[in-house]
Amino acid sequence: MAADYQGLELTTDSAAAADAYSNCMRGYMGYQTDVGVHLKAALAADGEMAMALITRGYFFHLFSIPVLEKKAADSARAAREAIDARGASQRERWHLAALQAWNVGDMAAATDCWEQILLHHPHDVMAIRLSHFTHFYLHGGGAMRQSTNRILPAWDKERPDYGFILGISAFSHEEAGDYREAEAAGKGAVEINPKDIWATHAVAHVYEMQGRQNEGIAWLDSLSPQWAELNNFRFHTWWHKAMYHLEKGQFDTVLELYDGQFWAEPSDEYLDFTNAAAMLWRLDYQGVDVGQRWSILADVAERHNGDAILTFADAHYMMALAKDGRMEAAQTLLDSLAEAAKGSGEQARVAAAVGLPVCRATLALCQSDGDDAGAAADILLPLRDHIWRLGGSHAQRDVWAQMVCRALLDAGRFEDARGLLAQRTATKQNSPIGWRWYAEALEGCGDGAGAAAAREKAA
């Protein structure tokens, strides 16, 4: 028997395998690029190490690529065989159960396994990170905060990677709307480790949600030198910087960040793609000519047409296909989502309830015979309080909040738009875009004085 760097038992007699696995976990917590190298080293030292095999399966799932789903299942079988031959701790058996649940699309059952682990082993960083991930896509900020609140008392500054846990807590609080606690925790984590990009991004979310664009730009500028050696999550953090400049109307800067930072090269990573697609959609709403950028995204989207693994990603693939006029490919995506919606897992239910209608509305807005804003509004308006089921953060999902507001305005449904935009400007008072659109709605309702006041706030 051996132990990882948190003191948790690992079923292996190889010290080299245990050390490599610990390095893998450290790298995973820190968004390092050598995580896979360390995992391969662990398996090279002990090819039957159950936790290494299970972790390999987890990582295959995190890519959300169909060809890797089979490899995740293969990893689970190998781990099962290793456990049958060697035995395993209850913690490792729970991890195997989580992977097996994920293999059949039952992300909720997988999350339950990780939460069970954390009740007994609150220092299991893999269970912490993965439950954080699945709560993010399934249950939202409240569940994220509850999960981290359960484990946080077991951590202190003397324990390795305490700062990373503080960063996870920060983002959980932010998504639950507790911005004061989120900002304090995130800045505390960054003070411990300036390379903590998850904590950096948690604070960036606070600035985004509160409309503190100048502070957000300064925050990210001060920390961006720390990201050079980190994995592709750094692109998402650059995306946050672009969001501030977008709100300030600095569209040339947004395009510079798009081309030079978060979409410098086409990527098949779904997070990279969603950064790019959502930003182009927002730029289109501001009347910005994005050139051939949609076409490049549509090429990537076509490669993933039919994936139907993560509905959040599929909804962004539809943006690119529809905007670039690839209607046949867009219909193929709808068909694949409809087929996926017949399944039994959480993502099947999300696809049926939210993903399919959102994709249909997106397509309606881009039909070659003219934008059908009214049809899109009819689809999106009843869904506005259910979009959270797609997963993603408040900031990411805001593209669909913008979509329903813009569809209502373009369809001439100014009273409906007025209500939604009143709500929007009340919760995000420093949003010039929100105030401009609110002015448009008020003007359409015949409230010239109100429109003028809204435009003043947008200035």
Where are the model-predicted features located?
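Internal metal/ion-chelating core segments
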Residues: 147-248
